[in-house]
């Protein structure tokens, strides 16, 4: 999860998030090199006194500063397209869980476990225990297995929401009347936090998401939910 004064991304808990972090570093390096080059050119222009009134054109330079940015954009676009494909790929998920957004809570439905349905509300500050996170804890966590592809079917009952867990690299819109899906494979057990990432009304800031990831063998023993 995030930490105070954290500057980077959260630690990855899925292969897709690992790819996103790698792409972030790749794009940031390209941006840094371009910025340094532009700053060097500006500094040289401001400090030099040399002029040449005989130069009317420089076709070689024009070709270079046209082709070079195009190459840089291609090098950035190719890994971006690959990650975009990975996020949309659905390949034989082991479990399907449905998430329904409401104003302002989430409903989860485990279709593979007899249609188990429960709501997940944010815990008010009066019900928090020492060490709990304000505005992030819920009464019922969504329990998910690790090391198995899980498909999340996401929709909304009223307005536009967005189901997001940054450490898993997940952000899928919950659209009324439409069923969106995303597939992920978690790699580490733990408790991970997210929030609705689409402004959905007065209490938009008070509908957190808490995913508890447990080993697959424990998950397969049956529902382990505390309701």
From Swiss-Prot:
Its EC number is 7.1.1.9. Mg(2+) binds at residue 198. It is found in: Mitochondrion inner membrane. Its main location: mitochondrion. Cu cation A1 binds at residues 161, 196, 200, 207. It catalyses: 4 Fe(II)-[cytochrome c] + O2 + 8 H(+)(in) = 4 Fe(III)-[cytochrome c] + 2 H2O + 4 H(+)(out). One of its GO terms (molecular function) is copper ion binding. The chain crosses the membrane at residues 15-45, 60-87. It is an enzyme of class 7 (translocase). It is a multi-pass membrane protein. CDD domains: CcO_II_C. Binds a dinuclear copper A center per subunit. Residues 1-14, 88-227 are mitochondrial intermembrane. GO terms for biological process: ATP synthesis coupled electron transport. Keywords: Copper, Electron transport, Magnesium, Membrane, Metal-binding, Mitochondrion, Mitochondrion inner membrane, Respiratory chain, Translocase, Transmembrane, Transmembrane helix, Transport. Its cofactor is Cu cation. Residues 46-59 are mitochondrial matrix. Cu cation A2 binds at residues 196, 198, 200, 204. Component of the cytochrome c oxidase, the last enzyme in the mitochondrial electron transport chain which drives oxidative phosphorylation. The respiratory chain contains 3 multisubunit complexes succinate dehydrogenase (complex II, CII), ubiquinol-cytochrome c oxidoreductase (cytochrome b-c1 complex, complex III, CIII) and cytochrome c oxidase (complex IV, CIV), that cooperate to transfer electrons derived from NADH and succinate to molecular oxygen, creating an electrochemical gradient over the inner membrane that drives transmembrane transport and the ATP synthase. Component of the cytochrome c oxidase (complex IV, CIV), a multisubunit enzyme composed of 14 subunits. The complex is composed of a catalytic core of 3 subunits MT-CO1, MT-CO2 and MT-CO3, encoded in the mitochondrial DNA, and 11 supernumerary subunits COX4I, COX5A, COX5B, COX6A, COX6B, COX6C, COX7A, COX7B, COX7C, COX8 and NDUFA4, which are encoded in the nuclear genome. Belongs to the cytochrome c oxidase subunit 2 family. This is Cytochrome c oxidase subunit 2.
């Amino acid at each position: 999860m995030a930490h105070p004064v954290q500057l980077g991304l959260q630690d990855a808990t899925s292969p897709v998030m690992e790819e996103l972090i790698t792409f972030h570093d790749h794009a940031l390096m390209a941006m840094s090199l371009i910025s340094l080059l532009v700053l060097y050119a500006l500094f040289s222009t401001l400090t030099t006194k040399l002029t040449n009134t005989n130069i009317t054109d420089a076709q070689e330079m024009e070709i270079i500063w046209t082709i070079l940015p195009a190459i840089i954009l291609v090098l950035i676009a190719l890994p971006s397209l690959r990650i975009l494909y990975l996020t949309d790929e659905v390949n034989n998920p082991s479990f399907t869980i449905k998430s329904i957004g409401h104003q302002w809570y989430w409903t989860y439905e485990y279709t593979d476990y007899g249609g188990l349905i429960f709501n997940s509300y944010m815990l008010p500050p009066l019900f928090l225990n020492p060490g709990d996170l304000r505005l992030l804890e819920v009464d019922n966590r969504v329990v998910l297995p690790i090391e198995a592809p899980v498909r999340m079917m996401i929709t909304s009952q009223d307005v536009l929401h967005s189901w997001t867990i940054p450490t898993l690299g997940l952000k899928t819109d919950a659209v009324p009347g439409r069923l969106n899906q995303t597939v992920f494979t978690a790699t580490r057990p733990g408790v991970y936090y997210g929030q609705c990432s689409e402004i959905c009304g007065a209490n938009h800031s008070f509908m957190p998401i808490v995913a508890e990831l447990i080993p697959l063998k424990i998950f397969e023993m049956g529902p382990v939910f505390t309701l």
